[in-house]
């Protein structure tokens, strides 16, 4: 028989939004999104025009797509910050920092219940954890205890009694806890001599990021053998108490397409004191996306917060300058950011501000940035030891700085790759990483020299790195590592 028609609702025709900016359109847009969610999914269309929004646009049900008429045609004009709309958001690590400097969005994709518990905690000034296991990281239960396995395995073995709970299509969380000797962190850093000698114990922010939590969908279950959608990111060793667990109800199959989010233009705030004029945030989201989306005059552009298997395609950050044009944190894994742009700022940077760039931190792993144009910013490995990430086919004016305090640990874990990177201002910092990142590859990078922010390696001894085609990115084949790897996988 015929497939049922997907539910479609229009914010102007069906919900009374005005496309001339004369009235607050947020209630109409959120009503339309809720209507789609209540029907099990659907598409919310926003015709060409400018829509004033005085509230957050929230996508909290799976399989809902918010679709404008194109980033050059549909504009959402945001008038208020997250501080005004939700409240002050302090840091769970203390001090007077504003967590809106790295969290939340004026378009916010997050499961309805998770968003409610998160914002309730913020209003109560409890400064929550932000990921897949709730505000205190205790919202989970064990489904299975897998047998030892190796990084890269797609099939794992679980006890027979556990296997009955692991049906095909179920989304589960792989949980790996560190041990007193911090051998899990050593493994993330490549298990080299430098990782074994590193002083992990006093890196209290880094150690707070463990356990490592990796969401994955089950694609096959036959007896005790469970097949996963993606290869294991790390070994499964008994000393790390590996478990497959439940997780908060995820947001899946949601997208934002064909629009510009423009915040009211206010001067950029001093570093770490952002009010939260933020762009699009994906939180506890799996297999969600943005396509043809521009954000303008924002504090922070596109955020991945405990998000996995999401794709940002044809996205752009422009306007008066931002703190994090793109950020990827709180254990975000397996995401793709491609055909992206960070456009040069339209006003000079105020004193006391910082520009990062394409950020990754907080034990986030296996993320890819591909086909980018960065007229400002840097490759912001923000400590917190991200690992296994690829940056490829990017042109960058390397004028940003990385962040991250010392208690967050190393800049890089193992297996970073920078491939075909064209550095127009010749600055080495965070571009050429053969002297910094263990088990890394720097392939086809422009000739660069050290100036500005200069880093020293976190790990002693041989880093086991590769430097190839230095000074001649135009000769590198394939020109785009991600596309080549994807082609091999699909064959």
Q: Where in this protein do the model-derived segments appear?
A:
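Short, glycine/acidic-rich beta->alpha junctions
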Residues: 24-28, 49, 58, 210, ...
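Short, T/G/N/S-enriched strand-turn elements that build extracellular solenoid repeat scaffolds
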Residues: 30-37, 52-61, 66, 76, ...
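Short His-Asn-centered micro-motif
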Residues: 46-48, 54, 59, 159, ...
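Right-handed parallel beta-helix
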Residues: 63, 72, 252-263, 286-297, ...
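Residue-level marker of regulatory loop/turn positions in helix-turn-helix DNA-binding domains and
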Residues: 21, 207-210, 248, 274, ...
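Catalytic domains of carbohydrate-active enzymes that cleave complex glycans
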Residues: 371-372, 376, 389-491
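Extracellular "leader-to-stem" segments immediately downstream of a signal peptide or signal-anchor
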Residues: 1-269, 441-491
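Extracellular beta-strand/beta-solenoid scaffold signature
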Residues: 82-124, 237-246, 270-281, 297-300, ...
């Amino acid at each position: 028989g015929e497939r049922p028609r997907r539910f479609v609702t229009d914010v102007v025709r069906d919900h009374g939004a005005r496309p001339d900016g004369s009235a607050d359109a947020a209630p109409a847009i959120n009503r339309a999104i809720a209507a789609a969610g209540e029907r099990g999914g659907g598409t919310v269309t926003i015709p060409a025009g400018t829509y004033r929004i005085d509230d957050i646009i929230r996508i909290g049900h799976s399989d809902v797509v918010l679709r404008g008429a194109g980033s050059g045609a549909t504009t959402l004009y945001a008038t208020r910050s997250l501080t005004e709309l939700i409240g002050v958001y302090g840091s769970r690590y203390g001090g007077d920092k504003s967590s809106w400097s790295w969290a939340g969005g004026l378009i916010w994709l997050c499961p309805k219940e998770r968003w409610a518990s998160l914002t309730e905690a913020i209003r109560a000034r409890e400064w929550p954890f932000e990921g897949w296991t709730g505000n205190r990281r205790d919202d989970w239960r064990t489904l299975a205890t897998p047998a030892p396995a190796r990084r890269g395995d797609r099939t794992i073995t679980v006890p027979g009694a556990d296997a009955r709970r692991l049906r095909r299509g179920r989304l589960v969380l792989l949980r790996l806890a560190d041990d007193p000797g911090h051998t899990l962190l050593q493994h993330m850093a490549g298990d080299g001599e430098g990782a074994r000698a590193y002083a992990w114990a006093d890196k209290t922010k880094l150690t707070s990021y463990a356990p490592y939590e990796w969401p994955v969908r089950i694609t096959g279950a036959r007896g005790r053998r469970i097949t996963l959608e993606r290869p294991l990111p790390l070994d499964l060793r008994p000393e790390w108490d590996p478990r497959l667990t439940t997780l908060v109800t995820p947001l899946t199959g949601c997208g934002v397409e064909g629009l510009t989010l423009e915040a009211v233009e206010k001067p950029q705030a001093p570093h770490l004191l952002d009010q939260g004029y933020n762009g699009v945030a994906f939180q506890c989201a799996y297999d969600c996306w943005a396509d043809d989306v521009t954000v303008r005059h924002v504090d922070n552009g596109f955020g991945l917060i405990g998000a996995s298997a999401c794709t940002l395609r044809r996205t752009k950050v422009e306007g008066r300058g931002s703190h994090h044009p793109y950020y990827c944190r709180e254990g975000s894994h397996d995401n793709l950011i491609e055909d992206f742009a960070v456009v040069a700022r339209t006003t000079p940077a105020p004193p006391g501000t910082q520009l990062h760039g394409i950020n990754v931190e907080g034990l986030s792993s296996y993320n890819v940035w591909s086909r980018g144009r960065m007229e400002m910013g840097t490759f912001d490995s923000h400590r917190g030891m991200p690992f296994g990430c690829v940056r490829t086919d990017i042109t960058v004016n390397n004028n940003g700085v990385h962040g991250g305090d010392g208690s967050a640990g190393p800049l890089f874990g193992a297996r970073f790759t920078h491939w075909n990177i064209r550095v127009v201002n010749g600055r080495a910092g965070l571009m050429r990483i053969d002297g910094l990142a263990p088990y890394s590859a720097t392939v086809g990078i422009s000739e660069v020299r050290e100036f500005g922010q200069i880093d020293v390696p976190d790990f002693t001894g041989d880093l086991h790195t590769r430097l190839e085609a230095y000074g001649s990115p135009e000769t590198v084949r394939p020109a785009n590592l991600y596309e080549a790897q994807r082609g091999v996988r699909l064959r």
